[in-house]
């Protein structure tokens, strides 16, 4: 059940004609009401999928996860491929596609980029509403002919990233990618819409140092932390180096070099 806090009360509602049953299922699963006249947000079932809408005057538009169309699809087609800074940050090179754990998945945009470039992705999202949006977007994407194979390389885990990482029992990821929530001051449209919408729900990631420490203990090859370009490093060990972009940078904490996988010889016939 989601703990309803002041300024972040949420109700579930169906906007699609036949969505009432589905809305009731989400409400039960998340422990949210279907009716709350004083709600600050509405998790809405629409014909185009699940979306989150802030209620009231002068609020940003609804946010949903869509890997098939829109900005994410455009980035997949025209974003620069392996030349993108995020690809360089996680260590993508010819013959190298590391396994990556995105421990701050959010809406899954960065994870989708890496999956589209061939990385096997695990995603962790701890905020249940954001995780629901992401789960819905992944489910819709699986049925698309073009991006279905990409979505197949993405699996979603819901819960506290630090706890999940500390109790990890599977083969460790080669790379752990972190993009902690940071107090943004930019006035871009993206910040106004998504950051304005999510900040009352998630706040800032005050446990980022503990998350970094857990990531460094699990990742076999490197940890990558995305930060606003002028933001300080996360408290803790200093990164080995950084890749700087126009508005953001990637702090790299290398452990050992990534190498191409050896190709096993074909069996004799």
UniProtKB/Swiss-Prot annotation:
Keyword 4Fe-4S attributed: no
Xref: HAMAP family: 16SrRNA_methyltr_J
Protein name: Ribosomal RNA small subunit methyltransferase J
Keywords from the named record: Cytoplasm, Methyltransferase, rRNA processing, S-adenosyl-L-methionine, Transferase
Job of this protein: Specifically methylates the guanosine in position 1516 of 16S rRNA.
GO MF annotations in UniProt: rRNA (guanine-N2-)-methyltransferase activity
PANTHER family: RIBOSOMAL RNA SMALL SUBUNIT METHYLTRANSFERASE J (PTHR36112:SF1)
Subcellular location: Cytoplasm
Main location: cytoplasm
GO cellular component, one term: cytoplasm
InterPro entries per the UniProt record, alphabetical: 16SrRNA_methylTrfase_J, SAM-dependent_MTases_sf
Family from the record: Belongs to the methyltransferase superfamily. RsmJ family.
Residues the record lists as binding S-adenosyl-L-methionine: 125-126, 179
The organism's taxonomic lineage, starting at the top: Bacteria, Pseudomonadati, Pseudomonadota, Gammaproteobacteria, Pseudomonadales
Catalyzed reactions per annotation: guanosine(1516) in 16S rRNA + S-adenosyl-L-methionine = N(2)-methylguanosine(1516) in 16S rRNA + S-adenosyl-L-homocysteine + H(+)
Keyword Plastid: no
EC number(s) given by UniProt: 2.1.1.242
Top-level lineage group: Bacteria
């Amino acid at each position: 059940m989601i703990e309803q806090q002041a300024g972040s009360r949420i109700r579930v509602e169906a906007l699609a004609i036949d969505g009432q049953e589905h809305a009731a299922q989400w409400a039960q699963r998340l422990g949210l009401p279907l009716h709350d006249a004083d709600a600050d947000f509405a998790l809405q079932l629409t014909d185009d999928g699940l979306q989150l809408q802030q209620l009231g005057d002068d609020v940003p538009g609804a946010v949903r996860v869509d890997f098939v169309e829109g900005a994410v699809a455009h980035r997949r087609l025209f974003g620069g491929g392996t030349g993108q800074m995020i690809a360089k940050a996680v260590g993508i090179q010819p013959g190298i596609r590391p396994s990556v754990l995105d421990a701050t998945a959010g809406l899954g945009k960065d994870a989708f980029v890496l999956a589209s470039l061939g990385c096997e992705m695990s995603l962790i999202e701890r905020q249940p509403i954001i995780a629901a949006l992401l789960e819905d977007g992944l489910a819709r994407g699986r049925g698309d002919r073009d991006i279905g194979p990409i979505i197949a390389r993405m699996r979603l885990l819901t819960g506290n990233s630090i706890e999940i990482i500390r109790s990890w029992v599977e083969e460790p990821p080669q790379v752990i990618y972190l993009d902690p929530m940071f107090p943004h001051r930019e006035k871009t449209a993206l910040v106004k819409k998504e950051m304005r919408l999510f900040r009352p729900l998630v706040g800032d990631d005050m446990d980022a140092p503990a998350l970094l420490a857990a990531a460094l203990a699990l990742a076999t090859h490197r940890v990558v932390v995305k930060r606003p370009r002028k933001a300080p490093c996360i408290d803790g060990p200093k990164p080995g180096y950084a890749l700087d972009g126009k508005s953001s940078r990637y702090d790299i904490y290398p452990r050992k070099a990534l190498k191409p996988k050896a190709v096993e010889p074909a069996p004799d016939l």
